[in-house]
Structure formats: C-alpha cells, structure tokens
C-alpha cells in the first residue's frame, strides 16, 4: 500500500496543499480529478519524491520516503507526463532503455524487455531507431509509457498523459491504456481534469479543489451522493464528456 499521511506543501503564497491523508491499494487504478491548479500534480510529485512535503510522510509499505532512500524507491515507480518528456537527441530505444543501461542491466535482458514493451503498447520495433521528432504524438506517448515500464515498476504515476493529443489519437490511446492497465495489474495513479477520461479508467476517483480533497469514491458515488455542492457543479460542467462515454459503451 502507498500512503500519504497528513502531508502538506506550500508552493507559493497563493497555493498550499492542505494537510491530507490518502492511501492507494496495490493493483488499483485511482484518478485524481479537478480544475487546473488544484493540487493534483503536486500529489504525484510528492509520491515520486520530486518535492519534499512541509509536513507529514509518504510511505511505500512500511518504508518512509526520504532523501536517503528516494532514489531506490523511484526505481519502483514509472512516471509519464503530458508531453512525454522524451530526450530529443536520443533514439526511441535509448530513451526507453536509459535507466536500464545506467543500472548496467545485461544487454540481452534489455533487448528482451524492449521486445516485450513494443508488443505491449502496440509500437512497431522498427520505430526504436527513430527519434522523438519523427513520431506522432500518440507514438511519443506510447514510448513514454514504455520508458516508464522498462524496469517493471509496481507503481505508475501518469500526469495528464493524454492531454496534449488530438481527440482521435486520444480516444484510441485511451482504450489501449485501459487494456494495458488491466493486463499489468499494477498500481496506477493518474491525473486528469477530464471527467469522462477519469470515469473511463478508474474504479475510484478523488476530486480536488484549491489544494483540498472534496470527495473520494466511485463515479456512482459522486453522481448520486455528492459530498459537496462543488461535486455536482464540476460534474455538470463536464456532462458532455460523460454522455460521450456512455454512448460509446
């Protein structure tokens, strides 16, 4: 289990992540939703050890994330951001295998893993020799996912992974990602501001606003048992994405 225990973080005079406690069961998919600037990405960065909490602790099982073990714990997680974050001067293969080669994993093991990941994300192995600029947006995000999965982490952190894609590519990758998550059985924590996208992926949603958790529950919980008027307001503003999701089911 992954836990945030009474964690807070002030990023600027205008934004503070209020003390919050969250736990994420192994093998589940949870989506953090809410408007831009509400603290969703800050939660991911805290989990990844990219920022240090002002108070509280981040725990992986019984281990507390701290400076001394942050690098080791990061090897257990994969991180995908909106634009992919690929190194433009490296080939696709070098981007994906970067961490494995830094850790001096055997080359036959790396080759085998590259083949497995190409099959998993439906990317042609021929693209491994290309550079990110030669790929479409959807292909770059598939490569970013491959890189995140290279070391077979138990945790995937996805920060708006589909946000920069056109609608057609986004829809296709959305379906593929859900299949991949189900196949891998990993703990997935994803950030989006799109309610339809959140409902597509998650068993459980966490709605945030102004650095606070407004409600945590299933889509049905949020629709039928809103804990705050803002829950209904947020969902109503995104009624069209939810209706599209329902019509596609």
PLM features: residue spans?
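Conserved ABC ATPase signature
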Residues: 131-135, 139
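Conserved catalytic motifs of ABC-family nucleotide-binding domains
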Residues: 152
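ABC ATPase "signature
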Residues: 216-217, 225
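Conserved ABC ATPase "signature" region
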Residues: 108-126, 179
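Helix-to-loop junction immediately C-terminal to a conserved catalytic motif
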Residues: 48
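Conserved ABC ATPase "signature" C-loop
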Residues: 210-211
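ABC ATPase NBD coupling module
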Residues: 64-78, 102, 108, 222-226
């Amino acid at each position: 289990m992954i836990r945030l225990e009474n964690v807070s973080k002030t990023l600027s005079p205008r934004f503070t992540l209020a003390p919050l406690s969250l736990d994420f069961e192994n093998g589940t998919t949870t989506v953090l939703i809410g408007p831009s600037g509400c603290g969703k990405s800050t939660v991911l960065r805290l989990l990844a050890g990219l920022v240090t909490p002002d108070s509280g602790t981040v725990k992986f099982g019984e281990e507390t994330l701290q400076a001394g073990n942050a690098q080791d714990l990061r090897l257990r997680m994969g991180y995908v951001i909106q634009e992919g974050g690929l190194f433009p001067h490296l080939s696709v293969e070098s981007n994906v295998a970067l961490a494995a080669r830094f850790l001096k994993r055997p080359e036959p093991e790396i080759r085998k893993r590259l083949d497995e990941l190409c099959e998993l994300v439906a990317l042609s192995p021929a693209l491994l020799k290309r550079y990110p600029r030669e790929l479409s947006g959807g292909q770059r995000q598939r490569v970013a996912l491959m890189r995140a999965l290279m070391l077979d982490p138990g945790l995937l952190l996805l920060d708006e992974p589909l946000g920069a894609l056109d609608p057609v590519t986004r829809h296709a990758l959305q379906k593929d990602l859900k299949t991949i998550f189900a196949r891998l059985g990993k703990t997935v924590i994803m950030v989006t501001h799109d309610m339809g996208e959140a409902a597509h992926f998650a068993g459980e949603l966490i709605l945030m606003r102004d650095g606070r958790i407004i409600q945590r529950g299933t889509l049905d919980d949020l629709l039928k048992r809103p804990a705050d008027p803002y829950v209904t307001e947020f969902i109503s503003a995104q009624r069209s994405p939810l209706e599209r999701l329902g019509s596609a089911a």
